[in-house]
Amino acid sequence: MMKKFFSILSVFALIFTVASCGDDNKEPQPETVTRSALMINHIVKSASGEVLPLSESKIDYTIDRNNRRVTEVTLRVAIDGSAETTVKLTDIKSETSDQICTFKGSGNGVQNLVGRFDFNEGTIRVNYDLDGTYRVISTMPEIFSTECATSCVYTDGTTSKSDGTMYQFSIDPASLTSNMTVMSLLDQSKKRTLTSVKTLTKAKVAVTKEGYVVESETTIPTTTTYKFNGKLTTTTLYPVSKLKATIDLENDKYEATMQLGTIAVTANGKVTN
């Protein structure tokens, strides 16, 4: 009986030893990780205000995951068709609040760098001056305005307002066009919340000194989903017309007017990525 008891103890000891060794052999998680993202560069000549053609490039950024900080940034930008300039900044000062890391830096021809990284969404954006000559705002192709104040006017003259609607624009710098998605919009006339309204063709994009104006003179067909009896339903009854959306990257402002089916929509908010 005693031999059996000690045999059982030996088995438990062996299991404990193996488990302990497994814990000791675990490689520690790296404190930093470097990521890359494709960016659209909005470029303006500082002195004259001349708007230059958009360019695309990658940004590299290093994150200290333990302290939730951006510690290094490598910028790339091509000015008006010239060769791409690469600048690495290591003297970065950053702080994080509510999942958003804001960071600043300068050096190697870059002045007044201000950026933000969203730990939840994985989005990054930077504004900076280059060589004292150019103002550059680099964003990812998808530009968001979340929790936007939205007013709707219906055909019978009634109105509704909401603060939780989100607008997304996907900018194509080559064709200067953009798709649009509207999310969480209340249609009070039909007592339904539109989960998403996605345009099926692109609107035109004009590049301004501050950012972009997205507009369309023609009606854009959409695919719209909404919940009905607990299930998602799809409809085409919310085409977009009379669209004019102003995206002010310099001041982080968003304004838009459009006709969404029979609903006249006005939106005001912030650029949030």
Predicted feature locations:
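Extended lipid/amphipathic-ligand handling interfaces
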Residues: 58-65, 88-94, 114-119, 166-172, ...
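N-terminal glycine/threonine-rich, aromatic-flanked beta-hairpin/loop signature
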Residues: 54-88, 160-198
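Polar/charged low-complexity regions in secreted precursors and cytosolic/nuclear IDRs
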Residues: 48-49, 56, 64, 80, ...
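Contiguous, well-ordered beta-strand patches that form the walls/edges
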Residues: 76-114, 188-241
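Bacterial Sec-dependent N-terminal signal peptides
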Residues: 2-10, 14-40, 129-148, 258-273
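Short, hydrophobic/aromatic-rich segments at coil-to-beta transitions
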Residues: 30-38, 68-73, 95-104, 142-149, ...
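Flexible, membrane-facing loop/turn or short amphipathic-helix motifs
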Residues: 41-52, 82, 132, 137-141, ...
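Repeat-associated, polar segments at repeat-unit boundaries in modular proteins
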Residues: 90-94, 114-142, 201-203, 210-212, ...
